[in-house]
Amino acid sequence: GRDPEVLPPGPRGLTGPLRVGIDARELQGRPTGTGRYLRNLLRVWTRHTDDAFFAYFSGPAPDDPALATDRVVERPLRPAPHGVLWQEWRLPDAARQDGLDVFFSPAYSCPLRLDIPRVTAVHDLSFFGWPADFSLVDGLRRRLLVGSSLRASTRILACSDFTCREIACLFPDVKSR
């Protein structure tokens, strides 16, 4: 990774390289499907764009080959007692300091307190269709956060046609994003 000071501050017009923030917590710990998705996106983006990527972590950044490029700035932030608190309090403040142009959330929910364009990836909405597969608190948290995040996002990446149809059905107000 690279130090934030060596990259020029944003925001800029969309004609030059972007400063892209990423909620990179999915790269920490044991790899998940979303973590592998993010790792592959980072590999492609750092090879095929001139953009700078700021990868935000709750605690130390992992030793991950996808981060081993001068185009990725590792931003380990102090953990919070709960992931939602980290996402809504620690992350937005750090993202503002970094002068980002856009923020990418690879796992269903984005920081609602950010005031820059957000792009949120949604892999499925199983917590709506099969609520019994989730604890009461986790299912409720996911259902509340995904709706708010989709409404706050400038763009939504539905990772399958089925998920796109689910989003259009459950959240018709955001289906054009």
Outline where the language-model segments fall.
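Carbohydrate transferase catalytic cores enriched for Leloir-type hexosyltransferases
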Residues: R2-R177
